[in-house]
Amino acid sequence: MKINDLKPTIVWKFFHQVTQVPRPSKKEGKMIEFLESFAKEYKIAIKKDQAGNLLMSKPATPGMEDRPVVVLQSHMDMVCEKNNGTKHDFDNDPIETIVD
């Protein structure tokens, strides 16, 4: 089984896309570009401050405007650790996901 086979499919599709973007700490540029492109593709409003922080907002689904607002917060970078002797290059390689 692969990550894209998991349910709900749409969640794992987006998660997999994120794993393909190298994003070590202090080198979030590729992730910022990915998120800006994602926002444009899905018509999500996005703002970037001088520090590179992103704020994305999406209006409520029609008919759901009276529902509570959902807020999600996340880091764009990843603390990179690997075992001695492994050849993974966190600056360039995607993360290989394993479904166990």
Please tell me what each predicted stretch does.
Residues M1-V21:
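N-terminal hydrophobic or amphipathic helices/low-complexity stretches enriched
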Residues W12-F15, M31, Q73:
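Bulky hydrophobic/aromatic packing residues
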Residues Q17-Q20, Q50, Q73:
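Residue-identity detector for glutamine
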Residues P24-V70:
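A non-catalytic alpha/beta surface segment that caps or lines the substrate-entry region
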Residues E65-D100:
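Active-site metal-coordination/substrate-binding segment of hydrolases
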Residues F14-F15, F34, F38, F90:
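Phenylalanine-focused residue identity feature
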